[in-house]
Swiss-Prot record:
Gene field: Znf32
Organism: Mus musculus (Mouse)
Its biological purpose: May be involved in transcriptional regulation.
Protein name: Zinc finger protein 32
Keyword set, alphabetical order: Metal-binding, Nucleus, Repeat, Zinc, Zinc-finger
Zn finger spans (CCHC-type): 244-266
Name of a matching Pfam family: zf-C2H2
Length: 272
């Protein structure tokens, strides 16, 4: 009627009859009533039905089934920590964390990396290449991930939330640093005096107290500072900029801290 070859119809009918017969056997064996099936029980029975059908297939058919998408495939386990990977190459890369092996070396500075992709990204420091550009403001980046984080400045997206105080962050590393406020963890310790810090950047700035290094110089008077923030703050002395305004009396200040001190005394005067 539909124009299919007779042999095809017979073959299809034969397979259908076999499946119906097998389904009936399974129904009896597992005491399954399709009319009473709901949700997971129906799914579990169908899964069992497919599994037992698979066991009846030839080894060749089962091998093809196991290689098909959606079917559990071979996993590669790390002998050191037990972590599993779907690809052998991913396991090899992971194992270098345990062995410390870094076979990819930068020819310009000698720094080594576990993965070739990391070396390629690093080399952009030397070449100045920044292939990832923000469509919003035109700023360019050497890494795709850095661009993704930057774009959240424009969108306001902060997908990483602290489970303790619900404060949100643009990237995962900032969230990790923030969590140390709650845990009290300070993993970065000064070798000179033993003082510990929650952020690596804070340790770097602190070390300058011991070394005397002041890499940020004022363009007006050449006075130098340990941090860029202090240098920018000092620059307001020359420009006369006073961006911090008291909402009660209108007086303005160059530093936020100075405004805070003033507001305490200002509010006391107004209440008298």
């Amino acid at each position: 009627m539909f124009g299919f070859p007779t042999a095809t119809l017979l073959d299809c009918h034969g397979r259908y009859a076999q499946n119906v017969a097998f389904f009936n056997v399974m129904t009896e064996a597992h005491k399954y009533d399709p009319s009473e099936a709901t949700g997971s029980s129906s799914w579990d029975f169908q899964s069992s039905f497919r599994r037992e059908k698979l066991e009846q297939k030839s080894p060749e058919s089962k091998a093809l089934q196991e290689d098909s998408p959606g079917v559990r495939q071979k996993v590669y386990d790390c002998q050191e920590c037990g972590k599993s990977f779907r690809q052998k190459g991913s396991l090899t890369l992971h194992e270098r964390i345990h062995t410390g092996q870094k076979p990819f070396e930068c020819t310009q500075c000698g720094k080594s990396f576990r993965a070739k992709g990391n070396l390629v990204t690093h080399q952009r420091i030397h070449t100045g290449e920044k292939p990832y550009q923000c469509k919003e403001c035109g700023k360019s980046f050497s890494q795709r991930g850095s661009l993704a984080v930057h774009e959240r400045l424009h969108t306001g997206q902060k997908p990483y939330e602290c489970a303790i105080c619900q404060r949100s962050f643009r990237n995962q590393s900032n969230l990790a640093v923030h969590r140390r406020v709650h845990s009290g963890e300070k993993p970065y310790r000064c070798d000179q005096c033993g003082k510990a810090f929650s952020q690596k950047g804070s340790l770097i700035v602190h070390i300058r107290v011991h070394t005397g290094l002041k890499p940020y110089a004022c363009s007006h008077c050449r006075k130098s500072f340990h941090t860029r923030g202090n240098c920018l703050l000092h620059g307001k002395v020359h420009t006369g900029e006073t961006p911090y305004l008291c909402g009660q009396c209108g007086k303005s200040f160059t530093q936020r801290g100075s405004l805070a001190v003033h507001q305490r005394s200002c509010s006391q005067r107004l209440t008298l």
